[in-house]
Amino acid sequence: MAKIALPRKFFGRRTEILEPPYLLSIPKNSFENFVQLKVNPYKRKNVGLEHIFRTSFPFKDPDENFILEYLGYEIGDWECNRCGYKPKDDLLGGWDVDCPECGAKLVYKEKFTPEECKLKGLTYSAPLRVMLQLKAKTKNGYRTFPPRKVYFGEVPLMTDNGSFIINGTERIIINQLIRSSGVFFDEKEEKQKDATITRILYRASIIPDKGSRVEFELSGATDLISARIDRKKLSAISVLRAFGLETAYDILKPFYEGVRKYIVKDKYLYDAETGEEFTPEDLEHHYIFAILKFKAKIAGFGTSKEREIIEERYIEEWEELVRILDDERIEVLSVTSVPRENVIKSPYGKSLVDTLATDTSPRDADRRSPVKVPAEYTLRDYGLMEMYKKLRHIEALTMEIDSIIERARVYFNVFFRDLKRYDLSRVGRVKINAKVHNIPKVLKPTDIDLLDNLPPLALAEDYGEYKAGTRITKELLKELFKNYKEIKVKDYTEDEARFLLPIDLINILKYLIDLRHGRVKKDDIAHLGNRRVRSVGELLENQARLGIAKMEKVFRDRSATIHPEQPDLKPQDFINPRYVTNAIADFLKTGQLSQYLDNTNPLSELTHKRRLSALGPGGLTRESAKFEIRDVHPSHYGRICPIETPEGQNIGLVTSPTVYARVNEYGFLITPYRKVENGRVTDKIEWLAAYEEENYVIAQSTPTDEEGRIKAEFVLARHKNDIRLVKPEQVDYIDVSPRQVISPSSSLIPFLEHDDANRALMGSNMQRQAVPLIFTQAPLVGTGMEKKIARDSHAVVVAKRGGVVEEVDGSKIIVRVNPEEINLEDPLDIGIDIYELRKFERTNQKTCVNQRPIVKKGERVEKGQIIADGHSTDRGELALGKDVLVAFMPWRGYNFEDAIVISERLVKEDVYTSIHIEELEVEARETKVGDEEITRQIPGVPERALAHLDEHGIVRVGTYVKPGDILVGKVTPKGETRLTPEEKLLQAIFGEKTKDVKDASLRCPPGVEGIVIDVQVFTRKGGKAAKDMLAQKVEREELEALERELEKKKNLLMSGVEKVLKGLILGKKTDKDVKIGKKEIKKGTEITEEIFKEYSQYILARPENFFTDEELIKKIREIYTRSRTQIDMLQKVYQEKKETLLKRRDLPPGVITLVKVFIANKRKIKVGDKMAGRHGNKGVISVVLPVEDMPFLPDGTPVDIVLNPLGVPSRMNVGQILETHLGWAAKELGKKIGEMIEKGRDRKAITEYLKEIYAVGDENGENAKFIEEFLNSLSEEEFWSVVRDYAQRGIPMATPAFEGADEKAVKELLKKAGLPESGKTTLYDGRTGEPFDFEVTVGYMHMLKLIHMVDDKIHARATGPYSLVTQQPLGGRAQFGGQRLGEMEVWALEAHGAAYTLQEMLTVKSDDVEGRSKVYEAIVKGKYTYTPGIPESFKVLVRELKGLSLNVKCMNGEEKPCDQVEIKEEEEK
């Protein structure tokens, strides 16, 4: 049986209503949406790359001589496995595409696997080919060229575990958390001339995804509304007119009751809707606006000719209207009025009317309103003109008004009605709709007229032939209401819905006025409803869009130089296709959000891939981010972890999504809740974004009865960022799980609820720094999340399909797949799954990845079962540290200030030993003076220094190397020198120069020692390298490995075929006499094992010679045909790989050979290493004590670690104490089971005892029932194996966050284990044997060894490299630098009067170049005197002064320039 993880005793609910989603879904789904690799290229959704290409093409040049249209794209090389067909220019290869030749599905051909890319320093990518069609203008229309696939370059692909491999290193793209597009309302203090008065300015900002930012401002001082576009101030009314709210009637109607529009006939007013007659006097106490038409001159015409103009004018009194009606020169087109009383009573007050009145009031002496425009135009044109003049700084007198209006129309259409320039995006539309439009979820027949006052809507579900997402019109609704009583609707987010609409502006102004009157609150920038996640796909999409914009520019430029009548034009003639892929590749290599993957252990890898950052392009900066944005916000609940964030300047800006958080289609974080109906909790799950949950009452996870009713009379619930007690009937939703609030890292901390948040933060961060150990051990006290994290981080190997383990060793597992799971369509599926295990691989942090199988040969495995452990995992569970026996007590001052005392047992038994792998590489390059060479012949190096190198000069695997040892011998040509006659003679005889070379070997750097575990040699194929012995050796080894792989697969295939054949014919009798060579099988002979073994190949090839049963013969023939096809396919794949291997050039230009050497270093735990628990309890080892000196328990067991008890009270992380108690109980209960086995207890007694343990603290009896079912399902052998595991390891516990074990349960378990309920015991001093005065808390705690190891920190320099300019020693361990002697250190030496020491420090030990060499010579000769010279930094200072044209001379008798003079000390007289 496989080594399975023992089932944990759960203190929370064993079964969750909803399991946490796949933890890497955010980046992986985002990237899949970007490339849509697993979608048929002809059926791709309009997202990601497809969306960019569709919206950017067709390209047109200004004269429209050429049009370049987009037809589709393919990623990767595709081929038919059956007939070998490769797609031509007219077919896009891709998922689910049929081969036109034979009808089979095309298959993706991977050039290199991610593992090969890591080894060879390549980028894991696939070619992107875009199918484009060119059209060229001719006299008779357009000439269409056949479509062509254009190679756009390589697109980096995401590996299965969510990372990218760029030039051999694993990198990831961080998810960015940025402000979303949409409308935002805020308020700030308005500057007043009188500093004592403060007034508030209310602002509505409409932020699009791309394009100009439109803002409306309502002044608290004047109550007038103004607008800004890209920060430039202009009239709000002009902006409303430009967007389609043309007249006073259009603007005022949505805001006030009683707004009427009148038509004028014979000086009487008639209501435009009802036809009712009014006189001007009836409009007393009304606001009156009139549209007039008359002849006048308009400034800026350039001619004095009068034109008919129309103007809109505010008329203060009705008498003024009478005068205008009486004036025969003026034609009144329409009048709009609104009663003053209605305005005052209206919730929207006078703001809008006053703004409109101010804008249209007569201002000049001629009593003319400024709002006027020639009669052939409209008032909207006036708005467009005003907007254009302000934004483009056009003066009215400089241009004809007609041309200004024409340009203004074009300007508006380009900048506000073209998706390339202005796009609210789907997110922006959804946000605006949610904020200012009250959109019903369901429309009824009475709601048809509502459509006029709503933004565009779409069907939320399929209704007959009308699919979900179809745009709703009145006609469509009328049609649907014939068959349906109500229609579910959602936001429509395409086409004009992505522009700013008049209805948006009306509702935004309504909301702004509501904000002014305190009816609504301003927006909170930190609220997650206003912030969204830009994941990998979207970030790459933005880069690709920039590349396409450059490409379009090139298209325009090139099309100007090509004649449309030219024959044989190709898309490549017009574009530079690399822009798109180059933009993506550059972003992955150097982008702010592209980071070097932190894969110290599986948890750090998982967390890094899920990380959210508010920094990066378009985001915040560390300096500008205020406290509010960094702080925990109520909307983070269930979405962002309140605990896990870095300490330091990034605190609160870099965060982690919670266990259950997902991202919705608009990029907002969503979290699941269970629906509550009338106080009864249902199993219906709904995922809500932060902006959706505002209106609901949401309770935390609360106990319920059998019917699902909430037990408590009052429950704690959240509503609109407020927490309060409510009755169960008021609750709308309830949390899915108590773990919903925290991230995977935090969810691994047991008793999290008993830790102070600051320490929990350190605990969750330090778990990510735990080093994978050689021997792993899952924690005794866990939280139940260990398995989920191990699986989702891809550290363990999971069976892809069910089957039987055919073969297993340390490096691979071979599973013969269940027949029903074999894909018969794919000839390459031979029914065998081979899992290559990762062996001693180096991570980015130099830790070691090593996978170990946990299944045995012949064992049956199910799909999804864990079949191999990885680094830091144990039986499929995350195992970051070890459970060790700890005691909380001071020990002779050695654990002062968080220091840790450890036992020598941890060193001797390799408890905390880890492997670290150093990778060193050397290149042999082509140089101008000749080629570098990897060789054993190194000038000036004695033979003993080369003893560990092979014949090619490369270190042998298994050698123990120390700093300074040669790893790879390399020589470099020195350059051309004049040859002596002897050398010329030798050259003439042997035709080769005598080598004039210098040693450039790769040596083991300081601080690195260990065993060489692997050497990899890469040589360039072809050219000079082909003659090289080393290159031939490497090629031979690679080909042999390929052949071995082919043979292995053939053998596995044939053994599978034989098994199937055996099942068909074993025991059957032959129907004919068969003669094979000299041997003969008689008719009626039964086919036994021996006969089958000898003749199976003959039966397979010619079944008709043995049998007459047609059905049987047909089956055997099918088996034979399929096996032959598969062998042919395997041979073909081998051939392809061989060809690739023989012709490829993997190395960068100029490199002949690349050698990588991997050195493994086994590090035992030692003084100076950092250790930590899971509760933020960290410390540095101060002493390693012999086992006999450690304090010991009454039974003689010495403790492993002594921690300082003073580290607990002030830190308030009591969780560590509870973990210690529970860990002790768990271990001792295991020992009790061991005693029962020794006493020979039967299976039933042990099962009952385990049930008792598992029942502790379990109200529902779930645990006892579970363990009973589990143990009963095991065979006798499996049962005793599991029980022995319990005895050896202890009873594993799981105490999930916020529903963990309580004090009562811990005490009960301690009691059952026969331990004191206080968790304390008497300890004895290992040195004296005396008991300590007080009882001490003792128990098992999961302690981690962190990556901050003393071996990486300690550093000492004697001599080493110097800076080029100042000649001072370099700084830092990496540069093998020295210690800085700063100003304060100089003062100290001065204060002590240590003049000679100081002189030494400032001269010969630093940058006195001549003095340094003189000191060396003196020491060699045994003299210890020296003469200091001028420090180089002084000379640098002098040269810098000369650079400022200041000549400095030294006045010591010789007036030489300072950087040449020698300062001589006066000789002693």
Swiss-Prot record:
GO terms for cellular component: DNA-directed RNA polymerase complex. One of its GO terms (molecular function) is DNA-directed RNA polymerase activity. SUPFAM superfamilies: beta and beta-prime subunits of DNA dependent RNA-polymerase. GO terms for biological process: DNA-templated transcription. InterPro entries: DNA-dir_RNA_pol_bsu_ext_1_sf, DNA-dir_RNA_pol_bsu_external_1, DNA-dir_RNA_pol_su2, DNA-dir_RNAP_su2_dom, DNA-dir_RNAP_su2_hyb_sf, RNA_pol_bsu_bac, RNA_pol_bsu_CS, RNA_pol_bsu_protrusion. The keyword Transcription applies. It holds the Pfam family RNA_pol_Rpb2_7. PROSITE patterns: RNA_POL_BETA. Its EC number is 2.7.7.6. It catalyses: RNA(n) + a ribonucleoside 5'-triphosphate = RNA(n+1) + diphosphate. The keyword Transferase applies. Keywords: DNA-directed RNA polymerase, Nucleotidyltransferase, Transcription, Transferase. Belongs to the RNA polymerase beta chain family. NCBIfam families: PRK00405.1, rpoB. The RNAP catalytic core consists of 2 alpha, 1 beta, 1 beta' and 1 omega subunit. When a sigma factor is associated with the core the holoenzyme is formed, which can initiate transcription. DNA-dependent RNA polymerase catalyzes the transcription of DNA into RNA using the four ribonucleoside triphosphates as substrates. This is DNA-directed RNA polymerase subunit beta.
